[in-house]
Amino acid sequence: MSLEKISNPQKYISHHLNHLQIDLCNFKFVEPGKIVSHFWVLNIDSIIFSLVLGCFFLSIFYTVAKKITTGVPNGLQASIELIFDFIRSNVKSMYQGKNPLIAPLSLTVFVWVFLMNLMDLIPIDFFPFISERFFHFPAMRIVPSADINITLSMSLGVFILILFYSVKMKGLIGFCKELTLQPFNHPVFFIFNFLLELVSLLSKPISLGLRLFGNMYSGEMIFILIAGLLPWWSQFFLNVPWAIFHILIISLQAFIFMVLTIVYLSMASQSH
């Protein structure tokens, strides 16, 4: 649906909640609002923006690392050093053990999630207008962390690391004992313990992904509602205060995702 053809707030809101999707069965764009009966559909917009932001993050940090100086740093180098020191202090205080992977992983998670969240502050009609006018795309959403597929994919990666370090540190037998001998250390409760621990284990990636998705989706929805329901001359008085408050949410959600990643991996890396 073209932006020019949207005639009421309901259509406007519905249009901005549609992803740019491609059907892998015929490699054609899915019409906005159409329900596809099979699984093989990709949200192209979320994938593209998340990859672009990831490459942007890597290029900035790589450029600063190549030009780093021991003298008085410039503004960008000073900012990155502050972020690095912040991440390192959190890892030291929360991760019980020594693992050279945890700090870089935490830095990547924090900055990448923050950049994805930050896209929520861009005016919601900007990229859809450009994509429709110049590329004839039927829909476009630009906040990857407001797509449950992206957030659950990231949490799935964390979950795989949890399983890897649990087996590595405790051994396969030790990991199985952890699932069956807690909280009641008796053979009678093996099945009961396993069910409890399985729910606890699976709830970590699910809650990690859903928490980020829920907060960012609701924030994006408020921006869409303001733009769709209010006249243009009054939107400023709600958009600006909400955007200022949303900066806190953006930063906080990136921090929470990073902290829980560190905590979960710390728990998995304990040998007992």
UniProtKB/Swiss-Prot annotation:
Membrane topology (UniProt): Multi-pass membrane protein
Alphabetical UniProt keywords: ATP synthesis, Cell membrane, CF(0), Hydrogen ion transport, Ion transport, Membrane, Transmembrane, Transmembrane helix, Transport
Entry GO MF terms: proton-transporting ATP synthase activity, rotational mechanism
Major localization class: membrane
Gene Ontology annotations for the cellular component aspect, listed alphabetically: plasma membrane; proton-transporting ATP synthase complex
Pfam families recorded: ATP-synt_A
Subcellular location: Cell membrane
Record function comment: Key component of the proton channel; it plays a direct role in the translocation of protons across the membrane.
Binding partners and assembly: F-type ATPases have 2 components, CF(1) - the catalytic core - and CF(0) - the membrane proton channel. CF(1) has five subunits: alpha(3), beta(3), gamma(1), delta(1), epsilon(1). CF(0) has three main subunits: a(1), b(2) and c(9-12). The alpha and beta chains form an alternating ring which encloses part of the gamma chain. CF(1) is attached to CF(0) by a central stalk formed by the gamma and epsilon chains, while a peripheral stalk is formed by the delta and b chains.
UniProt protein name: ATP synthase subunit a
Organism: Buchnera aphidicola subsp. Schizaphis graminum (strain Sg)
